[in-house]
Each structure stands twice: as structure tokens, then as C-alpha cells.
Amino acid sequence: VKNKSVGIYLTNHQINVNILKTLDKEKNDFDYVYVKLHPHIKKTEDLYQYGLKIVQSNIMVEFLILILLDNGNKLSVFHENSTSVIWFQDRIINKNMGQPFEEYDIVASYIQSKEL
């Protein structure tokens, strides 16, 4: 995938159906929409009703994000307080759908303030 608009949902140990519903509503805003499953998730049949592409791999999501960005894609990342996206805050559209979590905000702010 190169030079496209991509939405990707990074699941936690459980799949948040509300995020799937949001992606289902917004999928026409993207050329591609992916769900990157947490490696512990094995059951996927319920996901196919949303028409989203499933990435079921043990590859670290940071590598997937980096590959998508390096190929010139505009990337919107939907997640729930995932620290995986912190390193890419200046290069992605960060859609944190998680509950407020003070420690996450502190870490994200600290990393964003540094020139890495």
C-alpha cells in the first residue's frame, strides 16, 4: 500500500466493538482499513461482518506503522492508550479511543517533548 489513506485499529487483549462500529461508519474516508489484532486474539470470525482487513500476525505493530508511513501513506491509528503509537505522534492521526489514563498521558507528553 503506497500513498493512500489508511485507517488501522490496534486491538488490546480484547476487541472493542465500539471502535469497530466507528471504523465501519468511517471506512469510506479511507482507501484501506485494517484491524491489527493483539497476538493473544485468535477468534476472528466476528470481525468479518465489518468488511475490514484483518492483520493477524505476531509482528510488532511499530514495524507495521513504520512500513505504512515510509510508503507515503496518511495513517489514522485507532487505539486504546497504546504506547506503540507514541513514537509516531508527529506522523500519524492519533485516534485514542481509550478511557483517560494519566500515566499514558504523562509518557506521551514526555516523549513528544523530546527530539528523538
Language model features with spans:
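Active-site donor-nucleotide binding/catalytic segment of nucleotide-sugar enzymes
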Residues: 1-23, 31-41
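Short, surface-exposed amphipathic charged segments that create phosphate/polyanion-binding patches used
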Residues: 2-4, 67-75, 108-115
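Hydrophobic beta-strand segments of well-ordered beta-sheets in folded domains
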Residues: 4-9, 30-35, 73-78, 92-97
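Short, charged/polar "capping" segments at the starts of alpha-helices
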Residues: 15-19, 41-47, 102-107
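Short, basic/hydrophobic alpha-helical segments
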Residues: 21-29, 67-71
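Structural alpha-beta junctions
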Residues: 25-37, 49-59, 91-95, 115-116
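Donor nucleotide-activated moiety binding/catalytic core segment of transferases
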Residues: 40-89
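Catalytic binding pocket for nucleotide-activated donors in carbohydrate/polymer assembly enzymes
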Residues: 84-116
